A protein has these predicted regions:
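Helix-coil boundary and interhelical linker segments in multi-pass alpha-helical membrane proteins
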Residues: 698-706, 772-794
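Transmembrane alpha-helix/helix-exit interface in multi-pass inner-membrane proteins
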Residues: 267, 763-775
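Membrane-water interface at loop-to-transmembrane-helix junctions
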Residues: 742-761, 789-798
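ATP/pyrophosphate-binding catalytic subdomain of soluble kinases
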Residues: 762, 766, 805-808
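Generic alpha-helical transmembrane segments
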Residues: 717, 794-811
Length: 893
């Protein structure tokens, strides 16, 4: 079969078995999809489960646990007491940890795939004669698709129709200059049998981007049967970048590991000196005991569940955000959202409802001609079934305006024969249509100040007369009066031809026009936005409006929303052009409204705000918004009106295009970061307490905890409440605080001090419990006996129960780092459930005879011991209340 670009469009349609005006039927498309498969590039083969499982074993913590198991086994054999209970428990923990790691990876992948599906690219496809929006993955060869500026080309296609459509193909050809497409057959050059990809001007390829105009094309290749597929072969598996927080935690783990090694070496040396170097070298049991102390300390120091818990909390937060219509595309955005200080928001569709309605006219031409001209100079279409227009909201308003007057069959009666599509530089568009009497009429629609400037004549009823300066001033005043009412105003002008213009470029069409009139329409403010902006203000987040609208319209809406109080706080794109970057940087905070801006201005605005050390979020929907969105700290794409290009560079996509969703996402970002800090503080304070306890006990000369007991606390007692803390609701004042400084580390705000102090408090309670247990058992406390290894089992059990119960009580303290536990109004059901689970498991391991002997040896704790352990553990609540009160006073000062 001849290549598509060497064949006429009609031949290609015939080969694909499709009617250009009807597209494929849904049944035929389903049949073809079953044969060709989804329109996706192949992904790299996923790592098998068994390999993932063993990859988990390479974790330094897991290696340390395996070493502990080996040393424990050797110690038992050397002593002639081969009891492999400790070994079994440690290996069980290793296996469970690895299985959980694999499961978490799989869940993360599933969550990512689900989020990618939510933000999957959509295509405008003709099916059964109707234009529908479908996921690009469902395209099949033969589908007729519509393309317009901002769309990513979803498959390899043969162009059927092009209205000055230009496509950027740098991803394929390396050529950054957009290529103008046409539907004509490509002729082979003499002596050649093919055409270079970059010269195939009647083709558009997957991965390229429409940057100007619009067109229609038929799909000829999907998935791996595309030029992109040939180049890709198979996509390399993309690695998810670590977030700044995860990087900090990895660094924390490295620091802890170094500290552990240093402390272990010190303890190992102290123990050898105490036992005597000669004795240790001749007594393998003493050497192995010393090793076990060092391993215990290592197990105590490293919070095994921290990274997993933080990852799960982040993942749960992303899922929760998605339910609130904020789709996070980059995990680092979750953290940055909590620091956001300035939001640069589009007006249309984000602050407003994007449901434009024409409410006022300023007519020069007859009303029917004016309404028809506005509708014809639009790409929105009248849908008979819906009884309203479908398409871009502003153009829908114009087509609906004509529809109300009974003018609904205009495009069939007046076919379009030429056009100069809209672009933000010209601020207008022009079309040439055939009239009923065989002539041709040009309609130009756009910004009133631009269109009025191009007019030399004006309608007066049915007559055309010269446009005087006096009349021009009246039109400018009428435009301003409508804009002052917060109306979006568009002007219409016309021009008549006896034949189709040979040149339909903007320069050829847009001059010497006849003014027809003005349309004033309103896009109502979203009802929830004013409250959201007020909430943002309370949270130290400033909202500024960026719009292409007239400055008067923009200011009127900004006043309504509380963004500005008067016109002096607004600036236009033209004003920006007259300012140097230095001037803009110095005065950027003086303005809350940027009107009549073009996409290139947005990048300057972002840069200026960032020069003031602000964390900036920027919203956008058009292809030209991509640079400013990428430059912002948080790029926000629009899920409904946004182009594929914009969504692809955004950190977050708003599924509902709603400003209030951004504020909700900022709150969620603060909540997640707050909770992660609570989790870190909770886990590290426990680990520090374990380290201090083991370290002090070792220095004195007795053993307080075995590795298996510390593992129980770290992986069972601590992890469940830590996860529940990650699901804690936002504190009541979370949106009353200023944004946190993005440069602050995890331990900012005295958190390092909190961890150390709380670790010391827990250490005192645990050691006190140990000595009380020894006293209950022996009736006195004698250090020499304890060093000799006598009668410490009851003390160990009491210390273990106290450590577990302290953690269970302490997790409730950690619902807030500063607020009193007794002022928390909302309940965290997950925390109660996790605390109950940890309590039940602790009771089982201390009461069930087999497990108790495995963990503690042949010892039974009397009721007074249990009550004493509980009493000491409960002290963590009043002690923390005192500490919080002190810190509140210190931080207030």
């Amino acid at each position: 079969m001849q290549k598509e670009y060497l064949s006429a469009a009609a031949e290609v349609l015939s080969d694909q078995g499709v009617d250009e005006n009807l597209g494929l039927s849904n049944d035929e498309a389903s049949s073809r999809l079953a044969k060709t498969g989804p329109n996706k590039l192949e992904e790299a083969e996923k790592t098998p489960l068994w390999k993932r499982f063993f990859e988990q074993m390479a974790d330094p913590m897991v290696i340390m646990l395996i070493v502990a198991a080996v040393i424990s086994a050797l110690t038992g054999m050397v002593k002639g007491e081969p009891d492999f209970a400790d070994v079994a428990i440690i290996m069980f923990v290793v296996i469970v940890n690895s299985v959980l790691g694999v499961v978490q990876e799989a869940k993360s992948e599933e969550a990512l795939e689900a989020l990618q599906e939510m933000s999957a690219a959509q295509s405008k496809v003709l099916r059964d004669g109707k234009l529908v929006h479908l996921p690009s993955a469902e395209l099949v060869p033969g589908d007729v698709i519509m393309l317009e500026a901002g769309d990513s080309v979803p498959a390899d296609c043969r162009v059927l129709e092009s209205a000055t459509m230009k496509i950027e193909e740098a991803a394929l050809t390396g050529e950054s200059v957009p290529v103008e497409k046409h539907a004509n057959v490509i002729e082979l050059a003499a002596g050649t049998d093919d055409v270079p990809l970059g010269d195939r001007k009647n083709m558009c390829y997957m991965g390229s981007t429409v940057v100007y105009g619009r067109g229609r094309a038929v799909v000829v290749g999907t998935g791996m049967n595309t030029e992109m597929g040939k180049i890709a072969g198979a996509l390399a598996e993309a690695k998810e970048e670590l977030t700044p927080l995860q990087v900090k935690l990895a660094e924390l783990s490295r620091i802890l590991t170094i500290m552990v090694i240093v402390i272990c070496v010190v303890i190992f040396g102290v123990d050898i000196i105490r036992h005597g170097v000669g004795n240790v070298l001749t007594d393998p049991t003493a050497l192995l005991d010393t090793f076990m102390v060092a391993v215990s300390l290592a197990v105590a120091a490293i919070p095994e569940g921290l990274v997993a818990v933080v990852t799960i909390v982040l993942s749960l937060g992303v899922t929760k955000m998605a339910k609130r219509q904020a789709i996070i595309r980059k995990l680092s955005a979750v953290e940055t959202l909590g620091c956001t200080q300035t939001i640069c928001s589009d007006k249309t569709g984000t602050l407003t409802q994007n449901k434009m309605t024409v409410v006022k006219h300023e007519l020069a031409a007859p009303k029917e001609k004016f309404l028809a001209g506005m509708a014809l100079c639009s790409d929105a279409q009248w849908d008979e079934e819906l009884g309203e227009a479908v398409g871009e909201p502003t153009e829908c308003a114009l087509v609906n305006d004509a529809g109300k007057a009974g003018l609904t069959g205009l495009t069939a009666e007046h076919p379009r024969v030429g056009e100069a599509p809209f672009d933000s530089g010209r601020k207008m568009m022009s079309v040439v249509v055939e009239t009923l009497d065989g002539e041709y009429e040009q309609y130009t629609k756009g910004a009133p100040d631009v269109v009025i400037g191009l007019c030399t004549h004006i309608y007066e009823g049915d007559k055309v007369v010269p446009l005087t300066e006096e009349r021009r001033a009246e039109l400018v005043a009428a435009n301003k009066a409508m804009a002052d009412e917060a109306l979006r105003v568009l002007a219409l002008a016309s021009r008549t031809y006896t034949e189709v213009p040979a040149d339909c470029s903007p320069a050829a069409l847009e001059h010497d026009l006849v003014f027809c009139g003005l349309s004033g329409m309103i896009d109502p403010v979203r009802p929830e936005v004013a409250d959201a902006i007020h909430e943002a203000h309370d949270a130290g987040i400033r909202t500024v409006m960026i719009t292409g609208d007239h400055i008067d319209t923009a200011v009127a809406i900004a006043k309504q929303l509380g963004i500005v109080t008067d016109r002096s706080q607004a600036i236009t794109g033209a004003d920006l052009d007259r300012m140097s970057d230095e001037e803009l940087d110095a005065h950027i905070e003086d303005y809350g409204v940027y009107a009549r801006v073009q996409p290139e201005h947005k990048t300057r605005i972002v840069e200026a705000w960032k020069s003031r050390d602000q964390i900036v979020a920027m919203t956008g929907d058009g292809v030209n918004d991509a640079p400013s969105i990428k430059r912002a700290d948080i790029g926000v794409g629009m899920g409904i009106t946004g182009t594929d290009v914009t969504k692809n560079v955004a950190d977050m996509v708003l599924a509902d295009d709603n400003f209030a969703t951004i504020i909700g996402a900022c709150e969620e970002g603060r909540r997640i970061y707050d909770n992660i800090r609570k989790v870190i503080q909770f886990l590290l304070s426990a680990n520090l307490a374990e380290v201090f306890s083991v370290f002090i006990a070792t220095l004195i000369g007795f053993t307080i905890f075995q590795p298996v007991q510390l593992l129980w606390v770290n992986l069972v007692t601590d992890c469940f409440p830590a996860l529940a803390l990650g699901m804690e609701d936002a504190e009541g004042d979370i949106m009353k605080r200023k944004p946190r400084n993005a440069k602050d580390g995890v331990f900012a705000g005295h958190m390092g001090l909190d961890c150390v102090v709380q670790g010391l408090i827990i250490t005192v309670l645990v050691l006190a419990s140990f000595f009380v247990g020894v006293y209950f058992d022996m009736g006195y406390i004698h250090i020499a006996d304890m060093i000799a290894g006598n009668a410490d089992e009851e003390g160990v059990m009491m210390a273990f129960i106290t450590l577990n119960m302290v953690e269970i009580f302490h997790c409730f303290n950690m619902r807030s780092r500063r607020a009193s536990l007794f002022t928390m109004k909302k309940q965290n059901k997950w925390l109660w459930a996790s605390a109950a689970l940890a309590l039940v498991l602790t009771v089982i391991v201390t009461v069930q005879p087999t497990l108790a002997e495995m963990f503690f040896g042949p010892v039974t704790l009397e009721l007074k011991g249990v009550l004493a352990a509980l009493g000491l553990a409960f002290l963590i609540i009043p002690l923390m209340e005192i500490y919080k009160a002190i810190m509140r006073a210190v931080e207030k000062e």
